[in-house]
Amino acid sequence: MDKEKIEQAVSMIIEAIGEDPNREGLLETPQRVARMYEEIFSGLNQDAKTHLSKSFEIVDDNMVIEKDIPFYSMCEHHLLPFWGKVNIAYIPNKRVAGLSKLARTVDVYSKKPQLQERLNIEIADALMEYLNCKGCLVTIEAEHMCMNMRGVKKPGTSTMTSVARGAFEEDLDLKNEAYRLMGL
């Protein structure tokens, strides 16, 4: 990440909106924003394979659900935050991921400029590819600042997305059971 470019750009934005980048309260803002971007866009430098390739052998293939995984991301259209919770259900294929690995996978894909719809797809596809599960269902419920503070200005509006792969695409009863266990 080019922190120097970010600092220059933030300084230019401050100036472009009619503020003084040398004013006491804004003097270190470009550096703060650059450090913040390094943190909130850290998913750009990560690979979910690193997290999901370490798995544990199991005897049966019962459904695994990890729900209410908190996340935040930045809308790629306006660079405004959106945040919420991710639910993941999957059917193992004789191997399970450590529970923290699912949360880390959410971080990999959410910590970059993103669309909620794509975030769903990327998490599901990573589970299928790197965990080699028989199927997965990923749901996201999120609130978007681009809906709250600009445009239509509808605070409190929730956006729900859902992606099914493998067994969850093929078996509606399985999909409905996962939704029920997720509380949806």
UniProtKB/Swiss-Prot annotation:
Keyword Metal-binding in annotation: yes
InterPro entries, sorted: GTP-CH-I_C/QueF, GTP-CH-I_N, GTP_CycHdrlase_I, GTP_CycHdrlase_I_CS, GTP_CycHdrlase_I_dom
Keyword Hydrolase: yes
Annotated catalysed reactions: GTP + H2O = 7,8-dihydroneopterin 3'-triphosphate + formate + H(+)
Binding residue positions for Zn(2+): 75, 78, 146
Enzyme Commission designation: 3.5.4.16
GO MF entries: GTP binding; GTP cyclohydrolase I activity; zinc ion binding
Gene3D superfamilies: 1.10.286.10, 3.30.1130.10
Alphabetical keyword list: GTP-binding, Hydrolase, Metal-binding, Nucleotide-binding, One-carbon metabolism, Zinc
Biological pathway: Cofactor biosynthesis; 7,8-dihydroneopterin triphosphate biosynthesis; 7,8-dihydroneopterin triphosphate from GTP: step 1/1
Gene Ontology CC annotation, any one: cytoplasm
Biological-process GO terms, alphabetical: one-carbon metabolic process; tetrahydrobiopterin biosynthetic process; tetrahydrofolate biosynthetic process
NCBIfam families per record: folE, PRK09347.1-2, PRK09347.1-3
Subunit structure: Homomer.
Family as reported in the entry's similarity comment: Belongs to the GTP cyclohydrolase I family.
Name of the protein: GTP cyclohydrolase 1
Native organism: Finegoldia magna (strain ATCC 29328 / DSM 20472 / WAL 2508)
Phylogenetic classification of the source organism: Bacteria, Bacillati, Bacillota, Tissierellia, Tissierellales
